[in-house]
């Protein structure tokens, strides 16, 4: 009752929704970069909302099912096959013992999520399976290691009686230009009006310097007069403005404190879109209404968590 990894690709990680309550001692939450895709993959299989999955960055990826099960694939637009027969993303499928799943490079997007019925099982570290390489925590080894060829991931074999697919209106398009909503917090009101105008009116480009810790952007520099700050806690999606004026958006594996001035935070909805952005993608920022963002988040949490547990217990 396991999945045998034949080709892990450059970065495949066991992830759940992350570990919380330890940022005060320098432990980042980690967790799935694109929670929209993650949630839907579990939802398709009637899994607990926090059931562990494999986050596959880029690909290629190849694995063999050692036991019959239902599985789901959500996220990047990628060609995937089961025993050479094409399968559809954002839907559930069934595999028999010995079936081989193969995935190529994404046509659009960056990260795919592979879920199995019941979730992958592995010992927790600080309450989570999530892999954080920089903290050497979680994953199959409990030491923050990415998945490797030959790894065997256990799961409880379950076959769902019905195949399901995500309604089309909930499947995102990964575009070359994306609009990112910003909650204007932190030092936003200390920036000059000219700096704010630059931030919201200019296009910024995703550079090749992106990882699970943060996304570095390039565009017209944003000026900030103050040079020294006391380090403070870093929220998910915080937009730092370092000395060169080029924004850095901090992601799931971010450091827990930092001293750069910050324009605010990317709203949860658009962090998922950003997590799928590849180098060269252009970003246009806009000011996101706080109450609207809260309502969207509460609606999402109500749908995915209601009666569905927190998983991996």
Predicted feature locations:
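Conserved "landmark" site that anchors the functional core of diverse proteins
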Residues: 1-313
């Amino acid at each position: 009752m396991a999945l045998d990894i034949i080709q892990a690709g450059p970065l495949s990680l066991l992830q759940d929704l992350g570990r919380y309550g330890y940022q005060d001692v320098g432990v980042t939450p980690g967790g799935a970069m694109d929670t929209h895709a993650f949630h839907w993959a579990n939802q398709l299989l009637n899994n607990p909302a926090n059931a562990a999955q494999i986050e596959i960055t880029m690909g290629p990826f190849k694995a063999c099912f050692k036991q019959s099960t239902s599985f789901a694939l959500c996220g990047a637009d990628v060609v995937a096959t089961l025993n050479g027969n094409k399968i559809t993303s954002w839907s559930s499928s069934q595999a028999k013992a010995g079936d081989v799943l193969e995935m190529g490079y994404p046509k659009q997007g960056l990260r795919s999520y592979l879920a199995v019925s019941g979730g992958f099982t592995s010992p927790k570290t600080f309450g989570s399976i999530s892999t954080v390489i920089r903290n050497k925590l979680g994953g199959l080894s409990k030491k923050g290691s990415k998945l490797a060829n030959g790894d065997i991931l256990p799961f409880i074999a379950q076959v769902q009686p019905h195949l399901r697919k995500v309604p089309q209106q909930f499947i995102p398009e990964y575009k070359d230009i994306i609009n990112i909503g910003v909650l204007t917090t932190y030092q936003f009101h200390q920036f000059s009006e000219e700096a704010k105008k630059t931030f919201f009116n200019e296009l910024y480009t995703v550079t090749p310097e992106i990882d699970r810790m943060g996304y570095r952007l390039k565009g017209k520099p944003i000026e900030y007069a103050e040079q020294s700050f006391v380090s403070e806690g870093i929220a998910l999606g915080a937009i730092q403005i370092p000395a060169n004026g080029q924004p850095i958006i901090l992601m799931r594996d971010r450091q827990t404190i930092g001293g750069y001035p910050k324009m605010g935070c990317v709203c949860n909805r658009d962090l998922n879109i950003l997590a799928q952005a590849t180098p060269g993608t252009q970003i246009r920022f806009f000011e996101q209404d706080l109450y609207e963002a809260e309502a969207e988040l509460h609606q999402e949490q109500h749908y995915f968590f209601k009666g569905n547990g927190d998983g991996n217990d």
